[in-house]
Amino acid sequence: HGSGSSRFSPRNTYVAEVLQERGIGTLLFDLLTREEDQDYATRFDIDLLTQRLLAATAWLRSDPKTQALSLGYFGASTGAAAALQAAAKMEKNISAVVSRGGRPDLAGAVALGRVTAPTLLIVGGADYGVIELNQQADALMNCEKRLILIPGATHLFEEPGTLERVERLAA
């Protein structure tokens, strides 16, 4: 998830539940502690967020129950930037990346160019500043990718039916 959010947010738990209903295992966790999340600068420390995501990935890979499973990342806002940076570092070990209202630009041009996992960038059609950032990131990526705008949706996809469209696309 992204800045100012948590694993307990209704949007995050809803998407995780829908993915689980469709047979996709999920691990929903916070990239920052509560204290760290209070610091605005830390919320945008993409290198730190990426390190935390890579640590969680290593933990999953070390468990005999999960080590052989395909792994994908689903990130929102700054969490999407961390997902893309981590996917670039993990190369072919990540099967897919989904960004919901993400800030892929914060991953950096080099990382975006190194992502090999198929990537889905989902942006609200009324999230004007973020649309352009996703279009620019999309142009820098060399992997199989798709940018989808959800008509009428703002950054948090709070409008009726918009989050449901996100989960259908992600699954």
Locate predicted features.
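Active-site loop->helix "elbow" adjoining a glycine-rich segment at hydrolase catalytic centers
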Residues: 3, 77-80, 126
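Alpha/beta-hydrolase fold nucleophile elbow
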Residues: 64-77, 97
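A conserved short beta-strand
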Residues: 92-104
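Short beta-strand/loop motif that positions the catalytic acidic residue
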Residues: 115, 121-123
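Conserved alpha/beta-hydrolase "acid-adjacent" motif
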Residues: 128-133
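Serine-hydrolase catalytic machinery in alpha/beta-hydrolase-like enzymes
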Residues: 1-69, 156-161, 165
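Catalytic histidine neighborhood in serine/cysteine hydrolases
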Residues: 140-156
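Glycine-rich nucleophile elbow surrounding the catalytic serine of serine-hydrolase chemistry
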Residues: 73-87
